[in-house]
Amino acid sequence: MYQIGEALVGDGAELAHIDLIIGEKSGPVGIAFANGLSQLSAGHTPLLAVIRPNLLTKPATLIIPKVTLKNQTQVTEMFGPVQAAIAKGIADCIEEGTFKEYDIEDLVILASVYLAPEAKDYNKIYRYNYGAIKLALNRALEGFPPEKTILYEKDRGAHAVMGFKVQRLWDAPYLQVAMDLVDMGKVAKVLKEVPDNDHVIIEAGTPLIKRFGLSVISEIRKLRPNAFIIADMKILDTGNLESRMAADASADAVVISGLAPASTIEKAIEETKKTGIYSIIDMLNVPNPVELIASLKIKPDIVELHRAIDCETSCHAWGDIVAIKKAAGGKLLVATAGGVRVEVVKEALASGADILVVGRAITASKDIRHATEEFLEQLHKDEIDQFRVMTDF
């Protein structure tokens, strides 16, 4: 056996986080156990889990401090409530039948334990670590999480300690608010009034980036830290360099012009895959978007069918979205832009659009919040994480 478990329980300075490995004494876990006891490190000296002095728990468990213990207070907390919680939690697992299929004499456990230097409340330290060791152990023996849970959670979950969520586009349709503005005061007003919603995307428009540079992405991020932010750079040359610049500026996606040479487009897309951001091809003035997508060796994440502001009242609609998705041969989102108003949302969605790009209909509205909500209502999508506790399953 070589099983791995992890659990986070509690909050504040006393928060408990345990990484755990359980396996046979005769295997690699047993070797690691022996090495841990014999190869000591200052501030990270492992200790055995004991229920009380002279009484080990079984399976024998080695507690390894993750954070360097620098003073007597931390040492006392580790040798007191943490050690007691780990030992009692494992002993209770015996009573509850967690090990009924195993011989506890054959097994050992390595438990890497987080203890913040600021932790003070012994009661919380004990209770959080007690819950965490039991949860981590049961997860290890159950093989949690299954692949299905990982794939389901990877784009909807948020790390409980990190403090912000990195948005991904997995639950279309979305509303993209295009800020083709040149006044940071106006940008701040729009960002303040557009409601927080899992299905809202923020676009730093081309004029905004030309006026303030890519640093504007960071300014937007300060006001909307959890937002999915697009840098509409309309890349025409040096595709890899400009894609990297967008990623370095903390953009979640970058726009590449479909009029760029194929090699530039492909280099830009390749760079987005290296940096973990989305690639968007803007098909403004591209005569045959289907042909372009089919010709690319590496496909984008999103295609934007874009009618220019100067012709959005006279140009045709967005084209054959189904054919574009088919040409991509895989997962592809299609955004529709230019002249998108509330009354055409149903038409765009029915034609296969995944993202509705709206600019002045929101940013120039007298009531920005109300205008945004009108579009969101047409999406018929609930907020994903409105009532969600990110440590729950």
Curated annotation (Swiss-Prot):
Enzyme Commission identifier(s): 4.2.1.147, 4.1.2.43
Gene Ontology MF term list: 3-dehydro-L-gulonate-6-phosphate decarboxylase activity; carbon-nitrogen lyase activity; hexulose-6-phosphate synthase activity; hydro-lyase activity; orotidine-5'-phosphate decarboxylase activity
Stretch list, region 3-hexulose-6-phosphate synthase: 162-393
Record key words, sorted: Carbohydrate metabolism, Lyase, Multifunctional enzyme
Residues the record lists as binding substrate: 19, 48, 66, 68, 83
Spans annotated as Formaldehyde-activating enzyme: 1-161
Catalytic activity: 5,6,7,8-tetrahydromethanopterin + formaldehyde = 5,10-methylenetetrahydromethanopterin + H2O; D-ribulose 5-phosphate + formaldehyde = D-arabino-hex-3-ulose 6-phosphate
Pathway: Carbohydrate biosynthesis; D-ribose 5-phosphate biosynthesis
Cross-referenced SMART domains: OMPdecase
Record-annotated active site: 17
Enzyme's top EC category: lyase
GO biological process: 'de novo' pyrimidine nucleobase biosynthetic process; carbohydrate biosynthetic process; L-ascorbic acid catabolic process
InterPro entries linked to this entry: Aldolase_TIM, Fae/Hps, HCHO-activating_enzyme, HCHO-activating_enzyme_sf, HPS/KGPDC, OMPdeCOase_dom, Ribosomal_Su5_D2-typ_SF, RibuloseP-bd_barrel
Record function comment: Catalyzes the condensation of formaldehyde with tetrahydromethanopterin (H(4)MPT) to 5,10-methylenetetrahydromethanopterin. Catalyzes the reversible formation of ribulose-5-phosphate and formaldehyde from 3-hexulose-6-phosphate.
Family: In the N-terminal section; belongs to the formaldehyde-activating enzyme family.
Name under which the protein is recorded: Bifunctional enzyme Fae/Hps
